[in-house]
Amino acid sequence: MQFVQTSTLPQKTDQKFAVQKPIAIWLFVCCALVFAMVVVGGVTRLTDSGLSIVEWQPLVGTVPPLSQNDWDELFEKYHQTPQYKKVNLGMSLEEFKTIFWWEYFHRLLGRVIGLAFFIPFLYFLMKKAVDRPLGLKLSGIFLLGALQGGMGWYMVKSGLVDNPHVSQYRLTAHLGLAFAIYAAMFWVALDLLNPGRGLSANSGLRGLLNFSTMLSALVFIMVLSGGFVAGIRAGLAYNTFPLMDGHFIPPELFMLEPWYRNFFDNMTTVQFDHRLIAWTLAILVPIFWLKSRAVPLSGSARLACTLLLIMLAVQITLGISTLLLVVPLTLAAAHQAGALLLFTAALWVNHELRRQ
């Protein structure tokens, strides 16, 4: 792999930006595709469609069933799965087709994202538009994407053995990796359009940056917490708010032994943790926004801080509504999409503060 050494002379700044702008736009397009992938993946999970395709065929699997024989063969393979035997016994072929298409489009979109990243990457390399540091970053993102494909199948395999549900650990890893890939592409794209200027000596700004970094990490932790909520269907329990069936701290928090299992396997504890992180963000983000008003910031940085506050309010509203209405498909999918938009806002705030 060959990278070009980019000049750092001031007079070449405009020329460098002209080269980097198309790369940034391409990465933003890839971010949009990953966003769509997260939403489709959420719907696939919510409709219990993820176990409908029992084989991993990265190339051959691109072609959908084209004949009745193809459908019969796929349906017969599905008959051998724990999900069919324990959950969907007696399912008709037409019903199977519904869950099949969700999983098929989820996998197909993954292949599209891989090509949408790899082909332009090769093009920019051949055009010598990518210097060595950028090339290493993009190569790392591509490797993460390849790892994500394997992680997806590793997750599906966990539901094809005895338990007709995928492992919540593998599901959370799959979700977290999707957010990490998105974050890497989004950050690199922002760097290309608006490179950092170095940290300001302003102590208030440094404190605000540290605050925003903590918030970004907390949002990501909340996403992982949401993965466990989805993985063990904890959203179907305690469909009350603000209390959990009359308790702020429910008595079933530490039912399981050893105690640490409760954080991953106990529906009560998993939902409580997710609520607790949301409450924490509901307190900290408004404080952060108020602090940002007292620090001299650019217009784009102020906009980013305000969008973070707005997106948190939207996401909390979606989360509460999803809970109270017992996880309806549309709201639950919107809640998953909202998590990525909230994470995007947090990343943008962090990047903007590094440019002040």
UniProtKB/Swiss-Prot annotation:
Its cofactor is heme b. It is an enzyme of class 1 (oxidoreductase). Interacts with CtaB. Its main location: membrane. One of its GO terms (cellular component) is plasma membrane. It catalyses: Fe(II)-heme o + 2 A + H2O = Fe(II)-heme a + 2 AH2. The chain crosses the membrane at residues 23-43, 105-125, 141-161, 173-193, 212-232, 276-296, 307-327, 329-349. It is found in: Cell membrane. The gene is ctaA. Pathway: Porphyrin-containing compound metabolism; heme A biosynthesis; heme A from heme O: step 1/1. InterPro entries: COX15/CtaA_fam, HemeA_Synthase_type2. This is Heme A synthase. Belongs to the COX15/CtaA family. Type 2 subfamily. Keywords: Cell membrane, Heme biosynthesis, Iron, Membrane, Metal-binding, Oxidoreductase, Transmembrane, Transmembrane helix. Heme binds at H274, H335. Catalyzes the conversion of heme O to heme A by two successive hydroxylations of the methyl group at C8. The first hydroxylation forms heme I, the second hydroxylation results in an unstable dihydroxymethyl group, which spontaneously dehydrates, resulting in the formyl group of heme A. One of its GO terms (molecular function) is oxidoreductase activity, acting on NAD(P)H, heme protein as acceptor. One of its GO terms (biological process) is heme A biosynthetic process. It comes from Nitrosospira multiformis (strain ATCC 25196 / NCIMB 11849 / C 71).
